[in-house]
């Protein structure tokens, strides 16, 4: 059987499948190259994102080869391999998305000083747990060719949801709760007067939740389609949405990661526009991006008002937590007695600490006794960049 069988619906689905696979691989590769080239981006959160992209790429590459060679249609080892790649790879990507939500929550809300200590558990969870579903799928002999790929057969609806879509809904629900708690925390901080740039904080809030929105949108049609398939209905439009969006999750997640990080889109913007400068186009824009590609957004610490330790209605005030308008920066100011216990923390993974005396603070203390005291603060930056020194 050839790659195209003459059925318009199947051919459309196949073309979208290949397009989604290739775009997903390119997107993930771009993010990995960005993390490799830009040392400023090397922190705990970006390590989690890199693991997601690496997992997605390793899922999409063999899937693309199997689709192009059309060997899975005859069953046997290629068909089983295709089913393994889909089940294990997709499950692992979901879990890395959950770990990203956990990391951001721990850094912003819980102010975890050493988030990298959880990484070994992330590896075990994300690359170990999917083995269970994969082994059960193979042991129960549920694998069949189901259209454009091999997976759990149509007659095994219970296994489809028990081994795959049930865990997806559970993982997404936990991720959504963590993102909601993080967004609520930053919302309270912002509305307690944390910044003079409140009009930009809508963008900040969006960057905190957009990756989980992408996660849901890319897989919700797959869930709906499998429910409909369980009712012995196979609408072509729903199948096409399922095929493209679920397979292209890596691409849209990569677009989100690049959008959330000014360093990365400046870097790629400068590289892309270099081609056009040979023809005299976008010269000024390219020079501006090239000049600023290693510039992070200004640290919120630069507009610090000092520490007060006050709370408002049980919530942190603007003096306790300061968030910039971009997701990649959020500084949390702590009291001296909290900072003294953490002066030896490792700064390599997005934990940048600045201990300044009163003379370098942006706010001055009124009484002479207060002027003699040292105000110590800690800046913690989260997400996809650090505001430190580094080389391209």
UniProtKB/Swiss-Prot annotation:
C-terminal Ser or Thr residues may be phosphorylated. GO terms for molecular function: adenylate cyclase activator activity; cAMP binding; cAMP receptor activity; G protein-coupled chemoattractant receptor activity; G protein-coupled receptor activity; GTPase regulator activity; pathogen-derived receptor ligand activity; protein kinase activator activity. The chain crosses the membrane at residues 14-33, 48-68, 84-109, 121-139, 163-181, 206-224, 236-260. Residues 34-47, 110-120, 182-205, 261-392 are cytoplasmic. GO terms for cellular component: cell leading edge; cell surface; cytosol; early endosome; plasma membrane. One of its GO terms (biological process) is response to catechin. Pfam families: Dicty_CAR. Residues 340-367 have a biased composition (Low complexity). Receptor for cAMP. Coordinates the aggregation of individual cells into a multicellular organism and regulates the expression of a large number of developmentally regulated genes. The activity of this receptor is mediated by G proteins. PANTHER family: CYCLIC AMP RECEPTOR 1-RELATED, G PROTEIN-COUPLED RECEPTOR 157-RELATED. Belongs to the G-protein coupled receptor 5 family. This is Cyclic AMP receptor 1. It comes from Dictyostelium discoideum (Social amoeba).
């Amino acid at each position: 059987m050839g790659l195209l069988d003459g059925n318009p619906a199947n051919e459309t689905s196949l073309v979208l499948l290949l397009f989604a696979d290739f775009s997903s691989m390119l997107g993930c590769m771009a993010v990995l190259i960005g993390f490799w080239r830009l040392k400023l981006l090397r922190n705990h959160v970006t390590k989690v994102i890199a693991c997601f992209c690496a997992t997605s790429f390793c899922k999409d590459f063999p899937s693309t080869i199997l689709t192009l060679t059309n060997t899975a249609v005859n069953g046997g080892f290629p068909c089983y391999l295709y089913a393994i790649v889909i089940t294990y790879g997709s499950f692992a990507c979901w879990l890395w998305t959950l770990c990203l939500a956990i990391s951001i929550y721990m850094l912003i809300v819980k102010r975890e000083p050493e988030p990298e200590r959880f990484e070994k558990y992330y590896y075990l969870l994300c690359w170990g747990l999917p083995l269970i579903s994969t082994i059960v799928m193979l042991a129960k002999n549920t694998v069949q060719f189901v259209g454009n790929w091999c997976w759990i057969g149509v007659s095994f609806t219970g296994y489809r949801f028990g081994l795959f879509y049930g865990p997806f809904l559970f993982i997404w629900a936990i991720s959504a709760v963590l993102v909601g708690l993080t967004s609520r925390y930053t919302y309270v901080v912002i509305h307690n007067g944390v910044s003079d740039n409140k009009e930009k904080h809508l963008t900040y809030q969006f960057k905190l939740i957009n990756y989980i929105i992408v996660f849901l949108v890319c897989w919700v049609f797959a869930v709906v389609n499998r429910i409909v398939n369980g009712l012995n209905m196979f609408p072509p439009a729903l199948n096409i949405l399922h095929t493209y969006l679920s397979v292209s999750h890596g691409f849209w997640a990569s677009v989100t990661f690049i959008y959330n990080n000014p360093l990365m889109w400046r870097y790629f913007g400068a590289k892309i526009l270099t081609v056009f400068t040979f023809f005299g186009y976008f010269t000024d824009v390219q020079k501006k991006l090239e000049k600023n590609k290693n510039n992070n957004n200004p640290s919120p610490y630069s507009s610090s008002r000092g520490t007060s330790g006050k709370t408002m209605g049980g919530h942190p005030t603007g003096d306790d937590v300061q968030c910039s308008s971009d997701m990649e920066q959020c500084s949390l100011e702590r009291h001296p007695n909290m900072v003294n216990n953490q002066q030896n923390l490792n700064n390599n993974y997005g934990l940048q600490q600045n201990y300044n005396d009163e003379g370098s603070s942006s706010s001055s203390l009124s009484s002479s006794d207060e002027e003699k005291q040292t105000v110590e603060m800690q800046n913690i930056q989260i997400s996809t960049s650090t505001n430190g020194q580094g080389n391209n």
